[in-house]
Amino acid sequence: MKYDLVNAIKLNTETMFINADIMLQTCDMNYILCDMPIWKHCYHMLHSLDQWYINPKEYEHPLFHTENLNSLDITSEETLSKEQLQEYLQSIKAKITDYLNSLDDEMLYEIPTGCRQNRLGLIMSQFRHFYAHLGNINATTIIETNQWPRVVGITGKSGKSTEGLYE
């Protein structure tokens, strides 16, 4: 069995989780972007990652989820705290790490039950969605603080420091 592709996905996924953690530590959860508070943008991004990375057809919402809590088009009575979002991120990380540890490269071509995309397509779609929202959320931090939240890459050879929350 080959694991070259899965190992590349693992590396990029771990980097994604580090960047999400930095984002959650630096953003203002109450900042309003497109009529919604940033906490809701964070939850939308994390919920999508949780639902779509593995198999959206076999997904169970987290226990705290209520209808439309993940929607950026519908306001919510509930509010999620930074701590709740950080805990949710850690649960997603554990779930996805276990999933990736169960795969080999050949399995990336398989189409999960009920899906139209193969496993690789589902994963790639979440990288795209995740980083689009991370950029939006980090932009609000830049606007408010005039500081650029650190976005970590996979090589660490850019010459930039990899320590701290800001570039």
PLM regions and their residue ranges:
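Short, contiguous alpha-helical
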Residues: 10, 21, 26-71, 113-167
